[in-house]
Amino acid sequence: MAGLLGAAVVVGAARTWLIRAFRIQERDPRLAAPGGSETAPEGVAARVPTRRNRTLAARVFLPHPGRPVAVVVHGWGAGGADMLVLTEPLRRAGFNAVIFDARAHGASDDESFASLPRFAEDTEAVMDWLAARGLGPVALIGHSVGAGAVLLVASRRPEVAAVVALSPFSHPRPIMNTWLAAHGIRWRPVQDALNRLVELSIGHRFDTIAPVNTIKAITAPVLIVHGTADQTVPPWHAEAVAAARPDVPLMRLPGVGHDDTPGFTRHLDAVLGWLKGVVPG
């Protein structure tokens, strides 16, 4: 009995440590700032209901009535405000846009923890909010964890018109192992145990949410985009995802890093040119 109690204490302590370690410490509230209107360059603020009675802070840009909508998903620890740089290029390319803060990020409601599946749930909440207003078709653009989220959504939502995955990781496990090693946890059995604890905590096996697997179930056109100088999610991750679907193009961006907004901006015309070519409407 004492052994079981001791094990329970260790597991509980490890789970608490992981949750605290992954909590977003700084949150950018800019997305909630009042805007002009849905057709104005600055868009308009909105609150979108999502799971567990939470709401999301969103910014809605509808300069093109009846045209497709790009739903843009930020990465871990970032926020929708970091993706506002995309709104003007999207407008020029003929797209409407919605940018939002995932739960526990930016000006959205707090949550017990954030995870790739919850990013995906929030993306679907925005899609449902748009569908209730008769807006679409919807294309998804996601960065980093947001890229994994949009691939997961598209694997189970066939109405998605197209997906752009920016800097996706291939599988959560190597990302977690790298993070654990950076925190002094390098022994593989301990890494494996903590990875399993994360799976139990988020309610999903890593294999079921890994981009290298979810991309196989997507019927919509997909573009993978990755910077060759990405040190956070090294380029081999994108190579692995692309190898899982040889028909999916991989756009390599020379010298571009992970959170490299100027670098990505230099290549937006090519990325949005592809998107415009595959999305009807």
Predicted features along the sequence, with ranges:
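An N-terminal hydrophobic leader/cap segment in hydrolases
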Residues: 1-49, 57-59
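The serine-hydrolase catalytic nucleophile loop
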Residues: 76-89, 102
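Conserved alpha/beta-hydrolase
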Residues: 89-109
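Alpha/beta-hydrolase active-site loop
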Residues: 113-133
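Hydrolase active-site cap/lid region
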Residues: 152-204, 260
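Short beta-strand/loop motif that positions the catalytic acidic residue
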Residues: 217-219, 224-226, 230
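Conserved alpha/beta-hydrolase "acid-adjacent" motif
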Residues: 231-237
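Catalytic histidine-centered segment of alpha/beta-hydrolase-like enzymes
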Residues: 256-268
